[in-house]
Amino acid sequence: MLSDIDICRTTPLKPIEQIAAKAGLLADEFETHGLYKAKVSARCVKRLAEQQDGKLVLVTAITPTPLGEGKTVTTIGLAQGLQSLNQSVMACIRQPSMGPVFGVKGGAAGGGYSQVAPMDELNLHLTGDIHAVTAAHNLAAAAIDARIYHEQRAGYQAFEARTGLPALRIDPDRVVWKRVMDHNDRALRKVRVGLNDEGKTINGFEREEGFDISAASELMAILALSKNLQDMRERIGKVVLAYNLDGEPVSAEQLQVAGAMTVTLKEAIKPTLMQTLEGVPTLIHAGPFANIAHGNSSIIADEIALKLSSYVVTEAGFGSDMGLEKACNIKSSTSHKAPDCVVIVATLRGLKANSGLYDLKPGMPLPDALFQPDRAALESGFSNLKWHIDNAQKYGLPAVVAINQFPQDSAEELGQLKLWIQQLPLNVRVAISEGFAKGGKGMEAVAREVIEACDAPANFRPLYRAEQTLEEKIITVCTKGYGCGEVQFSDTAKQQLALYQTLGFGELAVCMAKTPLSISSDSSLKGAPSGFTIMVREVRLCAGAGFVYALTGNVMTMPGLPDIPAFMALDIDENGDIVGLS
């Protein structure tokens, strides 16, 4: 079988104008960026305001191996499968960060015959939205240090007299807005800025600083959760950048940088239209990670697609304990649109990995033994799939299991897994997923199950209520959402939660930052653990995005590169074609 990039390169694509017309967009509702990309205006939502929304299908997964279990392949393949059954369909996915592209996982365009194309354009820069997020974020960071410098170098009164602006009196030790970049770089997690020659202050005042990856920026979450440009502007104004010497929050609005930040994101608020290898219109928008952010593509993209098509297939990052939980408790509470159906991607290798019999490490190849028949390991890891099915139903959502087939998989084990699922005392559908090898035709069985599931009654219910305290919400997600026995809070986390409640942020949602490699916060606990303890070490405020996020375990908001990064395989030939991208 050809490599992903060779399949993509040898598949004829349609001009993006044809894809836009197929989706139902008018000529003034999109702007082309080259031959195969276009920015889409939300004007079409107003035009189609009376149009009934389509069905929203959310693709999630079991607890994955470090290389993932094929959610994007399933998302794109399912959209193609629905099209193959003559359904009107669009897909919505996140924009890939270049951190994973050059780091461990590689690209995020899908794979095989279920890809978004051109995959190299998708994985590398696209239309520049992540760079715009990075620029807007770092503009605020520069504004903070500039304000500290100008206020302190001659004193607050002199600053006010000189500028006519109120002195914000920012506490340099309580700046909470780190800088960001779209690469994995562990050396930047903790740095010092404002270094000067002795006796000088020309470079600003020295303080401790750090970098996050751009996907973890609050602006990325705001981009994904905003309903329109004005909503984004208001949210950016609410972002808390620092605290002053009296312990009061200093916002982007107070720093008078919110308008310029929004201007920087003016084009980024428009989703990018591309196509799958079989011509399904696909919107790519926003790229928050699911382990350190809320892990779902944008509300705006969903809204556009739901007005234009009968089915919209989107995905949520990592397993259902991560992206699905956040889709239900953060995204849906903002958009007021819950999924009509959940598709849970399962693989033989992923379930065997959840047996706990294999030592898997991020950045290292999966052991060959994972692809060998092993009924005992499969049966042991099956508890993980049962947990994720039950988790989807916890939110009142109909579920379909898509068993993502790999070429090495045993037909006997695939049949056995399907039988076990059918024998569960749960209302769940199941089909074998062959989107990687066969494209849409290989996904028709899953598509039929999804159509039936979308017609079944749903009784959506989030885990917690807005009026609960932040601590209660965190405990609810950990106990009801993960099955943990006890939640502990560090002294730092307790102080932060008390501060946020006092400042009036108690009604915000909570976003858990934890390992994706276990339902718990300990990546070594496989299968379906219960009764474990979760330690919340820190809670950060994202007032503009509308949530606080609680850091657990050893989750880092700036990833590092592995021993053998994916960038080592990348190059370019004499024709300008990229090689080694997957």
Swiss-Prot record:
InterPro entries: Formate_THF_ligase (IPR000559), Formate_THF_ligase_CS (IPR020628), P-loop_NTPase (IPR027417)
Pathway: One-carbon metabolism; tetrahydrofolate interconversion
One Pfam family cited in the UniProt record for this chain: FTHFS
One example of a Gene Ontology biological process annotation: tetrahydrofolate interconversion
Catalytic activity: (6S)-5,6,7,8-tetrahydrofolate + formate + ATP = (6R)-10-formyltetrahydrofolate + ADP + phosphate
GO MF entry, a single one: formate-tetrahydrofolate ligase activity
EC number: 6.3.4.3
Classification via Gene3D superfamilies: Domain 2, N(10)-formyltetrahydrofolate synthetase, Formyltetrahydrofolate synthetase, domain 3, P-loop containing nucleotide triphosphate hydrolases
Keyword tags: ATP-binding, Ligase, Nucleotide-binding, One-carbon metabolism
Enzyme class of the recorded protein, top EC level: ligase
List of residues binding ATP: T65, P66, L67, G68, E69, G70, K71, T72
HAMAP family xrefs: FTHFS (MF_01543)
Family per similarity comment: Belongs to the formate--tetrahydrofolate ligase family.
Protein name: Formate--tetrahydrofolate ligase
The organism's taxonomic lineage, starting at the top: Bacteria, Pseudomonadati, Pseudomonadota, Gammaproteobacteria, Vibrionales
Name of the encoding gene: fhs
